[in-house]
């Protein structure tokens, strides 16, 4: 048994698998997977994430022209195939990989899974990264036109169904200027 929860702007494809197994490719976006007693694989970029009894999140989103993959093991154990090698992951670990390599570290499960509860959670995250994430959830686009403000750290919990309230909060917290243009375009300086 497998359950899949897809975040906004997510595309997946079903892939052929052995009998009794399931295989999905995450083409782009973010999805949470849970499997109980069934062999299950998710392909993201050039690797397979393999699970039997686990809950995990896979994120494959363009960031600054790059497309890194981030795998977070929320519960159970995972294996990530890298050629003939397997990288073992356990609950509370996060693997980031791209064409240049990978890094395995402790995960902040609360941040990684916040979207599943209807929130975005940030801890000392540069405003530029916060805006990239906000842009996934609202129509239009926010542009930061001041490089200095882009580096400012943001911490907070924001409701996904109230994305435009974040602009007011950013404006107040950083004394930033917000210019609203037609089509949902926002200039932040």
Which residues are covered by each model-predicted region?
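A residue-level detector for the "anchor" residue at the start of short, highly conserved motifs
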Residues: 2-189
């Amino acid at each position: 048994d497998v359950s899949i929860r897809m975040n906004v702007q997510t595309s997946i494809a079903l892939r052929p698998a052995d009998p009794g197994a399931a295989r999905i490719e995450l083409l782009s976006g973010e999805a949470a997977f849970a499997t109980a007693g069934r062999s299950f694989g998710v392909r993201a970029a050039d690797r397979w994430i393999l699970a039997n009894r686990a809950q995990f999140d896979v994120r494959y989103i363009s960031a600054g022209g790059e497309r890194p993959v981030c795998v977070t093991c929320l519960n159970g154990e995972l294996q990530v195939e890298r050629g003939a090698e397997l990288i073992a992951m356990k609950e509370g670990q996060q693997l980031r990989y791209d064409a240049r390599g990978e890094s395995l570290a402790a995960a902040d499960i609360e941040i990684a899974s916040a979207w599943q509860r209807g929130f975005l959670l940030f801890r000392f995250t540069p405003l530029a990264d916060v805006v990239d994430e906000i842009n996934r959830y609202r129509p239009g686009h926010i542009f930061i036109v001041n490089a200095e403000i882009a580096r400012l750290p943001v911490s907070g919990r924001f409701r996904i169904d109230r994305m435009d309230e974040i602009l007011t909060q950013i404006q107040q917290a950083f004394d930033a200027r917000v210019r609203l243009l037609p089509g949902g375009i926002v200039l932040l300086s």
